[in-house]
A protein has these predicted regions:
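Conserved beta-strand hairpin/beta-sheet module of binuclear metal-dependent hydrolase folds
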Residues: 5-52, 166-181
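Short amphipathic alpha-helical segments
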Residues: 49, 77-80, 99-100, 190, ...
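Active-site metal-binding motif and surrounding structural segment of the metallo-beta-lactamase
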Residues: 45-91, 204-210
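Short, acidic/turn-prone active-site loops that include or flank metal/cofactor-
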Residues: 89-94, 182
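A short catalytic or substrate-binding loop motif that flags glycine-/basic-rich loops and adjacent residues
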Residues: 19-21, 137, 158-162
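Metallo-beta-lactamase
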Residues: 7-8, 35-36, 40-44, 96-225
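Divalent metal-coordination and catalytic microenvironments
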Residues: 11, 29, 39, 54, ...
Length: 228
């Protein structure tokens, strides 16, 4: 079954993951004033497919996209999103490093495309351009955004996966997006269990019924905590 736009609560939808192309779950929060996406996806093609699904459900395009962490499959669609992007300042720091590497190394894009079969599939062997950009707004502290009838809380967390984890909590719907925060460090997948324990404590204290991660499924909160 291909990617689908699933409604999981009154205001929240999830555009489901696609493992062969390493496309993560993308979130969508529909407010009466504006809507927000969670993560920008793997490429402009990923964004286009997501937006097509929104339009098929008569949902407006997001005015804001929050980024859960810097990895390419969550950020390399940023240049193609509608409206503005928002991320932790650590996320922009990592993306700035990628842009510097691209400028210094003419072979960077070729190396990236050949680093994994899922990346080659997503970028159609180079027919789609790789275009990293920085987020429009950097967060140095947590923030709540009133979308109209629903709130998006942008929360910081320790994570064994990256040092820039951003959680997105929708308190009215008791939904929490965590990106890849519970995974080990890429590419070794080494697990820092102290950070994992701190992440679990952070998730436990948030009032949520459903937790949406990056590449798996939609968890009941207790189900995820038992895995951690």
């Amino acid at each position: 079954m291909g990617q689908q736009l699933k409604k999981i609560s009154d205001h929240v939808w999830v555009y489901t993951f696609d493992s062969p192309k390493d496309r993560p779950n993308l979130g969508y929060i529909h407010g009466s004033r504006m809507s927000m996406a969670v993560d920008a996806g793997h490429s402009s093609s990923h964004v286009a497919d997501f937006y097509r699904a929104l339009e098929e459900h008569d949902l407006p395009l997001p005015a804001l996209t929050a980024i859960t962490h810097w990895h390419w499959d969550h950020t390399f669609g940023m240049h193609a999103v509608n409206g503005k992007t928002i991320a932790r300042f650590e996320t922009n720091r990592e993306l700035a490093g990628i842009l510097a590497e691209m400028k210094a190394n003419p072979m960077w894009e070729s190396t990236f495309l050949n680093s994994d079969p899922s990346i080659r599939r997503e970028y159609q062997n180079g027919r789609i351009r790789v275009v990293p950009v920085l987020a429009d707004e950097e967060l140095r502290q947590e923030k709540s955004i009133d979308l109209g009838s629903v709130t998006a809380r942008l929360l910081f967390a320790d994570s064994p996966h990256t040092d820039d984890a951003l959680l997105v909590h929708v308190p009215e719907d008791r939904v929490l997006f965590i990106g890849d925060a519970q995974l080990g460090q890429f590419p070794s997948w080494r697990m820092d269990y102290d950070k994992l324990d701190r992440l679990a404590r952070r998730i436990r204290e948030i009032d949520a019924e459903f937790v949406v991660d990056g590449h798996r499924h939609i968890y009941r909160k207790q189900e995820l905590l038992e895995e951690l």
